[in-house]
A protein has these predicted regions:
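Short, low-complexity, intrinsically disordered N-terminal peptides in bacterial proteins
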Residues: 1-2, 83
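Amphipathic, hydrophobic secondary-structure cores in small proteins
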Residues: 2-5, 9-55
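C-terminal structural segments of small proteins and small subunits
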Residues: 50-83
Length: 83
């Protein structure tokens, strides 16, 4: 299954993004992220279904709460994508 991870710098940042997405009708799972994703040790990500990624990014931009990094995850691995 392909999905996107929106990286957040803190749990509060992740919760704010999740609230914006929920208000836009997009469900997202908040997960703890390791140093490989955040490059800063502990952090959080929101798992976004591939079909909702563009709309999720628009909702975050409109709400002024952007992810610090966006990663695309597929069977082939994980790669960072442009915001």
């Amino acid at each position: 299954m392909d999905y996107y991870l929106f990286a957040a710098r803190s749990v509060t940042h992740a919760q704010r993004m999740a609230r914006l997405l929920s208000d836009a009708g997009i469900s997202a799972k908040i997960r703890c992220a390791g140093a490989a994703i955040t490059e800063r040790g502990c952090g959080y990500t929101l798992e976004i279904p591939r079909r909702h990624a563009a709309r999720a990014m628009q909702a975050c931009r409109a709400g002024g709460v952007l992810p610090v990094k966006v990663l695309f995850v597929s069977d082939d691995g994980m790669q960072e994508v442009a915001l």
